Amino acid sequence: MRGKFIVIEGLEGAGKSNAQRIVSETLAAHGIEFITTREPGGTPIAEALRNLWKEGEDGEHTTDKAEVLMIYAARIQLVETVIEPALASGKWVVGDRHNMSSQAYQGGGRGLAELVDEVGSAILGDFEPDFTIYLDIEPSIGLERARGRGALDRIEQLDIDFFHRTRERYVSLVKDNPKAVLINAEPAIEQVSADIQQAVEIFLTSEK
């Protein structure tokens, strides 16, 4: 039986790493074999593209449109070499970000929705997650949490309006996606973790 693809989405500081851990622990408790991935990244080539996108080269950074293409190049490399083979073998995949990130960040934040839709459709076709957990958080709260982890990266240093646009797009996407659920990521981590586990349990029940 083909595995299922569960994706964690959200702004910086929303708690995606914790969510991926909770989802993984819940699947393990049910005896489900799975792997975890992250985007951009997850393969040597995809990780190299991630580093190039985040760090640039000799002071040069990607333009907004080049960013879209680079992220989708990393994404399809991961899908074709890691995610699809795992799903085909019956393993589940728990991903830290997928296509909704591009729709929200590059489509909403960068204002390149049309390009993102065109590239995403051409690259991914009808491939999509079976279940998406979106962790919703007010941008200023998320960025404050991110600062607590250390220096902000190039994306995290963008103006707050960028993240408001990104969040607005996320909420719209989740509202229109019956395979996605919104979880308030602002309460204490114990509450958020419990909400995530409950969402996964409900999904597992629906798949029986």
Swiss-Prot record:
Does the keyword ATP-binding belong to this entry? yes
Annotated GO MF terms: ATP binding; dTMP kinase activity
Where is ATP annotated to bind?
A: 10-17
Q: Name one GO cellular component term.
A: cytosol
Superkingdom per UniProt: Bacteria
Q: Which InterPro entries match?
A: P-loop_NTPase, Thymidylate_kin-like_dom, Thymidylate_kin_CS, Thymidylate_kinase
What EC numbers are recorded for this enzyme? 2.7.4.9
Q: Which keywords are on file for this protein?
A: ATP-binding, Kinase, Nucleotide biosynthesis, Nucleotide-binding, Transferase
Give the catalytic activity: dTMP + ATP = dTDP + ADP
A biological process (GO) annotation for this entry?
A: dUDP biosynthetic process
UniProt keyword Kinase, yes or no:
yes
PANTHER family (UniProt xref): THYMIDYLATE KINASE (PTHR10344), UMP-CMP KINASE 2, MITOCHONDRIAL (PTHR10344:SF4)
This chain's function reads: Phosphorylation of dTMP to form dTDP in both de novo and salvage pathways of dTTP synthesis.
Q: Which family does it belong to?
A: Belongs to the thymidylate kinase family.
HAMAP family the UniProt entry points to: Thymidylate_kinase (MF_00165)
Provide the protein name: Thymidylate kinase
